[in-house]
C-alpha cells in the first residue's frame, strides 16, 4: 500500500473509532505486515505534524482538522493568503488578518466557508519584523499610524508622549511593542521621524527603512576592515601569475566607483582570440567566517538607488583594495579563454593573478574609440586595436549564442538623474550600445567557463539557474500575441529558440519593446542553487555568477569553491551541498528584495518628477488593459500611468478580457496592447507612486511630438 492510500485508510479508521488507538492496533486493523509498518510510522508522523491526529497517552486520536504552517502574504483589501510550502495558497479573511503582519510565519487551522478553503490562525511562530515605516494620523483626539507597506490594514496606536511630538502626515519608523490580537490593535514606539513628504522628498529613506536595508556596518566589521594592510605582501605576488605588464583595462558606467572586472585580448599564432577576464579577488580580503564575511552574506548584494548605494562591502574594500583601479597593482582571479573564428572555446585556464589596469574607460569612451574618435584615439592610442579586436570577438560570440537560442530581452531602462537633494531633475531611457555588449558577452563567457570547470573537477557549485517557463504563463503570452495579430505555431516543446524567434519577429515594429517585456514576464525568475538545471534564457547548460564579487555575495562563494578546486583541496561534499542549498535560498531572497526596493525607488522618483509636468502632453504605448482602463508607457521617459475608463467620454467601453482590449459599444473603437496614443498628465499620487493620464487621441500610425 502506498503512502497516500495508507494515509486515507488511517484517517478513515480513526474517524470511525470513538476511542484513540495504539500504533499496533492501527497496524492490525489495517492488516499491515512488518515492512508496511515502517511506512505507517512515516504516515503517523506526517499526520501528527499536520495536526490531523494527536497523541493522547501514547494513543492516536483523529482531530478532524488540517493544520498547516505558512507565511502570511497581505493584500491591500485587508485580506491575505497563507503561503504553504509545497502546497496551494489558502485565503485568510480580514478578521484573521488583524492578528498578523505581512511575512509572519504562522500555524493555522484549515476550514471551509461557502465551499472554499480558508484559515483560522492558531499561533504566530515567527514575526516578520519589528520595525515598520508608517504615516501619522490624528483622529478624534487619538493618534495612530498607518503602515506604508503591505501592513496598511493595521492601525497601530502610539503613546500620548509620542503623539505630542508628532504632526499629521509625518512619516515615522516605529518598533512594535505590542503585537495585535483579535481584540486589541498593535501598539508601537517611534524610534525615528523621517519627516513630512509634503515638505521634503523622503521616498528613498522610506523604502530603505521599509525593506530593513542596512545603512551602516557593525563596529566589529569597521575595525576588522581598518586592520587590513593596504600593501600587497611580496610573497602573495610571487605565488601568483604576474600580468602587471599586460595591456588590460576596465570599461564601466560613468558613475561607477568600484571596478570588478578588467579585460585584455591578443591573437594566438593560429589566429585564434585569446581573451583574458580579470576579476577582483575579493575572497583574498574577505576571509570565510570573519565579521566582514558574515555581514556581506547577510546583505547579499549592493543596493543601488539613483541618489546613493548601500554597499555590500565597506568602502575601503569596495572602492579601494579590491577595486581594479588604473595604474595600481591589484590581486585578481583570471579566466583565460581561447576562441576560434566560430566562437568555439578551444582552451581555457583559470588562475590567481596580479594585474595593473592601464586605463579606466567609460562605456561611451570605449564606443568612441571603436568608431574612431580622433580626440580619444590621441588620448588612448594603444587601446584602439584591442578594442576593435574585442568588438570582432563579441560579434562572433553573439552569433554563436544566437545559434544556440540565447534570448536577448534588451529592455530599455529608465535612468533617473537627481540633484544634491535627491530630487529627480530628468528621466530618460538608458542607452545600451556595443561597448556594453562587449563586456556583457565576455562576462557570460567567463561565468560559463567557471561553472563548467567546477563540474568537470567534481566540485559542487552555486549555479545561477533559470528554469523553463511555466506552460500556463506561456499560453497567456501567446494569447496576448495573437491579439496583436501574431500567428503562433505551438511547438511540442518550448525551447529558447521559440522565444528568440518571437522577439525577432517583432524587431523594428512599434510593439517591439512591449513584446520583449511580455516575453520576459512569462519567464521564470533566475535564482541561485547547487542543483544545475541550466540557464534557459541564455540557452546554457552550465552557468554561475563569478564576475561581480564586489557587489554580489554569490560570486564570492564561487571564487572560494574555485580556489579549492584549483588547489585540489578535499571538501565535505554533503556538508558543502547543504551550505550551498541554504545560501542559494537566502541569496535568491536577498536579490528579490534588492530588485523590489530598487524598482520601487524608481517608481517613486518617476511620480515625483511627473508632478512637475502635470498638464503636459506625451506620446506613449499601451502596455496593459484592465477592466478599469489602460496603462500607457511614455516614450520620452518610460513613465507608466493609467488612463481610467470613465475618462473615455466619446463612447461606453467594455473590457474584452480574452483579447486584452477595450471596445466601444457604439463606435466599435478599440484600445489594445501595443496601440500608440497621445496623452496628457492630469494627476500624480506621490504617496502611492501613481500617475494618471487622460487620452487626447489614439494615433493610427507611430507619430512623434
From Swiss-Prot:
Species this chain originates from: Aquifex aeolicus (strain VF5)
Domain S1 motif residues, every copy: 615-696
PROSITE patterns: RIBONUCLEASE_II (PS01175), S1 (PS50126)
UniProt record similarity statement: Belongs to the RNR ribonuclease family. RNase R subfamily.
Record domain RNB: where: 240-567
Entry's Gene Ontology cellular component terms: cytosol
Main location per the UniProt record: cytoplasm
InterPro entries: CSD, CSD2, NA-bd_OB-fold, RNase_B_OB_dom, RNase_II/R, RNase_II/R_CS, RNase_II/RNase_R, RNase_R
Keyword entries, A-Z: Cytoplasm, Exonuclease, Hydrolase, Nuclease, RNA-binding
HAMAP family named in the record: RNase_R
Protein name: Ribonuclease R
Chemical reaction(s) catalysed: Exonucleolytic cleavage in the 3'- to 5'-direction to yield nucleoside 5'-phosphates
Superkingdom of origin organism: Bacteria
Annotated function: 3'-5' exoribonuclease that releases 5'-nucleoside monophosphates and is involved in maturation of structured RNAs.
Entry's localization field: Cytoplasm
One example of a Gene Ontology biological process annotation: mRNA catabolic process
Listed SMART domains: CSP, RNB, S1
EC assignment: 3.1.13.1
Primary gene name: rnr
Example of a GO MF term: exoribonuclease II activity
Amino acid at each position: 500500500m502506498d503512502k497516500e492510500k495508507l494515509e486515507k485508510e488511517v484517517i478513515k479508521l480513526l474517524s470511525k473509532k470513538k476511542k484513540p488507538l495504539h500504533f499496533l492496533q492501527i497496524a492490525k486493523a489495517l492488516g499491515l505486515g512488518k515492512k508496511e509498518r515502517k511506512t505507517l510510522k512515516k504516515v503517523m508522523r506526517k499526520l501528527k505534524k499536520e495536526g490531523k491526529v494527536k497523541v493522547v497517552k501514547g494513543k492516536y486520536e483523529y482531530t478532524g482538522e488540517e493544520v498547516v504552517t505558512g507565511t502570511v502574504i497581505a493584500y491591500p483589501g485587508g485580506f491575505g493568503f497563507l503561503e504553504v510550502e509545497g502546497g496551494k495558497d489558502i485565503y485568510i479573511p480580514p478578521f484573521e488578518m488583524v492578528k498578523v503582519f505581512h511575512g509572519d510565519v504562522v500555524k493555522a487551522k484549515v476550514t471551509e466557508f461557502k465551499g472554499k478553503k480558508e484559515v483560522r490562525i492558531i499561533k504566530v511562530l515567527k514575526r516578520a519584523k519589528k520595525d515598520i515605516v508608517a504615516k501619522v494620523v490624528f483622529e478624534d483626539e487619538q493618534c495612530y499610524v498607518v503602515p506604508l507597506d503591505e501592513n496598511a490594514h493595521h492601525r497601530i496606536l502610539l503613546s500620548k508622549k509620542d503623539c505630542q511630538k508628532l504632526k499629521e502626515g509625518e512619516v515615522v519608523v516605529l518598533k512594535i511593542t505590542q503585537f495585535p490580537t483579535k481584540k486589541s490593535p498593535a501598539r508601537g514606539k517611534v524610534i525615528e521621524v523621517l519627516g513630512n513628504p509634503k515638505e521634503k522628498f523622503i521616498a528613498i529613506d522610506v523604502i530603505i527603512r521599509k525593506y530593513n536595508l542596512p545603512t551602516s556596518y557593525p563596529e566589529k566589521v569597521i575595525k576588522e576592515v581598518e586592520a587590513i594592510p593596504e600593501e600587497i605582501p611580496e610573497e602573495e605576488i610571487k605565488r601568483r601569475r604576474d600580468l602587471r605588464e599586460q595591456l588590460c583595462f576596465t570599461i564601466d558606467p560613468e558613475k561607477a566607483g568600484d571596478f570588478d572586472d578588467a579585460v585584455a585580448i591578443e591573437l594566438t599564432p593560429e589566429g585564434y582570440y585569446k581573451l583574458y577576464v580579470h576579476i577582483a579577488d575579493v575572497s583574498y580580503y574577505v576571509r570565510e567566517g570573519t565579521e566582514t564575511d558574515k555581514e556581506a552574506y547577510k546583505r547579499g548584494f549592493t543596493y543601488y538607488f539613483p541618489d546613493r548605494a548601500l554597499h555590500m562591502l565597506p568602502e575601503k574594500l569596495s572602492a579601494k583594495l579590491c577595486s581594479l583601479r588604473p595604474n595600481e597593482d591589484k590581486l585578481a582571479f583570471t579566466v583565460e579563454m581561447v576562441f576560434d573564428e566560430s566562437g568555439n572555446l578551444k582552451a581555457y585556464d583559470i588562475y590567481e593573478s596580479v594585474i595593473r589596469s592601464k586605463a579606466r574607460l567609460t562605456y561611451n569612451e570605449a564606443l568612441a574609440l571603436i568608431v574612431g574618435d580622433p580626440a580619444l584615439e590621441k588620448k588612448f592610442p594603444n587601446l584602439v586595436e584591442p578594442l576593435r579586436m574585442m568588438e570582432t570577438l563579441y560579434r562572433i560570440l553573439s552569433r554563436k549564442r544566437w545559434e544556440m537560442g540565447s534570448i536577448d530581452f534588451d529592455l530599455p531602462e529608465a535612468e533617473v538623474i537627481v540633484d544634491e537633494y535627491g530630487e529627480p531633475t530628468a528621466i530618460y531611457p538608458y542607452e545600451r550600445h556595443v561597448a556594453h555588449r562587449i563586456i556583457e558577452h565576455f562576462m557570460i563567457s567567463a561565468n560559463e567557463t567557471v561553472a563548467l570547470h567546477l563540474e568537470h573537477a567534481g566540485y559542487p557549485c552555486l549555479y545561477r539557474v533559470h528554469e523553463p517557463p511555466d506552460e500556463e504563463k506561456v499560453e497567456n503570452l501567446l494569447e496576448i500575441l495573437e491579439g496583436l495579430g501574431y500567428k503562433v505555431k505551438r511547438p511540442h516543446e518550448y525551447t529558447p529558440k521559440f522565444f528568440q524567434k518571437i522577439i525577432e519577429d517583432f524587431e523594428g515594429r512599434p510593439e517591439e519593446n512591449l513584446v520583449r517585456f511580455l516575453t520576459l514576464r512569462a519567464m521564470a525568475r533566475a535564482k541561485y542553487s547547487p542543483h544545475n538545471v541550466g540557464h534557459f534564457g541564455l540557452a546554457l547548460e552550465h552557468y554561475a555568477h563569478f564576475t561581480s564579487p564586489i557587489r554580489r555575495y554569490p560570486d564570492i562563494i564561487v571564487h572560494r569553491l574555485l580556489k579549492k578546486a584549483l588547489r585540489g583541496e578535499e571538501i565535505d561534499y554533503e556538508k558543502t551541498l547543504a551550505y550551498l542549498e541554504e545560501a542559494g535560498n537566502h541569496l535568491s531572497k536577498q536579490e528579490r528584495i534588492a530588485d523590489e526596493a530598487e524598482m520601487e525607488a524608481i517608481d517613486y522618483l518617476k511620480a515625483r518628477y511627473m508632478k512637475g509636468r502635470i498638464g503636459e502632453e506625451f506620446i506613449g504605448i499601451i502596455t496593459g488593459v484592465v477592466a478599469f482602463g489602460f496603462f500607457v508607457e511614455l516614450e520620452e521617459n518610460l513613465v507608466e500611468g493609467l488612463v481610467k475608463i470613465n475618462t473615455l467620454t466619446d463612447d461606453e467601453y467594455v473590457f474584452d478580457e480574452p483579447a486584452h482590449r477595450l471596445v466601444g459599444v457604439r463606435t466599435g473603437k478599440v484600445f489594445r496592447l501595443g496601440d500608440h496614443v497621445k496623452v496628457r498628465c492630469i494627476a500624480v499620487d506621490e504617496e502611492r507612486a501613481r500617475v494618471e493620464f487622460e487620452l487626447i487621441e489614439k494615433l493610427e500610425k507611430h507619430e512623434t511630438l
